[in-house]
Amino acid sequence: MKFIKPILVLFTFALTLLFITACGSSKSSSSSTGSKARTIEEIKKSGELRIAVFGDKKPFGYVDNDGSYQGYDIELGNQLAKDLGVKPKYVSVDAANRAEYLISNKVDITLANFTVTDERKKQVDFALPYMKVSLGVVSPKDKVITDVKQLEGKTLIVTKGTTAETYFEKNHPEVKLQKYDQYSDAYQALLDGRGDAFSTDNTEVLAWALENKGYEVGITSLGNPDTIAPAVQKGNKELLDFINDDIQKLGKENFFHKAYEKTLHPTYGDAAKADDLVVEGGEVK
């Protein structure tokens, strides 16, 4: 009988500990659902649509001298927020964390020039496209790269988390890659001569080369053509449907051609045609 009481005490303590642990697990599981995407009603109540964009990728998404976001992606972001009846709240992201910001519910939409790929479709849901691109390679004019074979034994600059990084790792492992988190750092590396060339979407390298004398896009199209589209958290059908409906409606108003004229034409001029880049109403032609 002497041993029964201590055993009962130990048993009671064990049950209490088990209960506390179970409660802790329950709270932990509950907190993990905190990353769930906001509903449209919640977005409207907050008064803000959180949009992931680039802050250093002119003319698509960048911060001007006044600290305001500008660019082709921003035009769409402004319109989506307006049509929801809220204000846009832009959040600067790197190429590598565009999906993560959606998954962790730090933003509602990603408009950071996000190329649609099968791998990314496993992480996020893409809406209808609003732009078409392929890869391009820019290099100094006096040592211009016009063929991928010329990159063998040379250093190619890429930005982490981009289709350029994936493409070269998969198809051209013989090319040495020098990787950067930010586009601005990657371009600066090219200017400093730390690499022989830089690859990303052809729309971007073309815009950059036009503003930086002494550089040329020697490879204007590489790999398969891709599309760029807004993305939402996986399973967020409500917001996805809204974006798709809005893109189709905006297409009837020729919205994306107007956005091109306002944000991209001043950079490209006659070097590019709107119909070669713009996707109107989500229909790729």
Question: Over which residues does each language-model region extend?
Answer:
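Extended ligand-binding regions for polar small-molecule ligands
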Residues: G24-S26, I74-D83, T162, A229-G269
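Ligand-binding clefts/hinges and TM-proximal coupling segments of bilobed small-molecule sensing domains
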Residues: S25-G34, T166-Y180, V217-S221, I247-K285
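Extracytoplasmic small-molecule ligand-binding "clamshell" domains
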Residues: S31-N113
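Flexible hinge/capping segments at coil-to-helix
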Residues: E42, S139-L156
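Short helix-initiation/N-cap motifs at beta->coil->alpha
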Residues: K89-E100, K143, K160-T163, Q178-Q188, ...
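A ligand-binding cleft/hinge motif common to bilobed small-molecule-binding domains
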Residues: E100, F114-K122, K170, L191-D192, ...
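Periplasmic-binding protein-like
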Residues: K132-S139, L206-I247, P266-K285
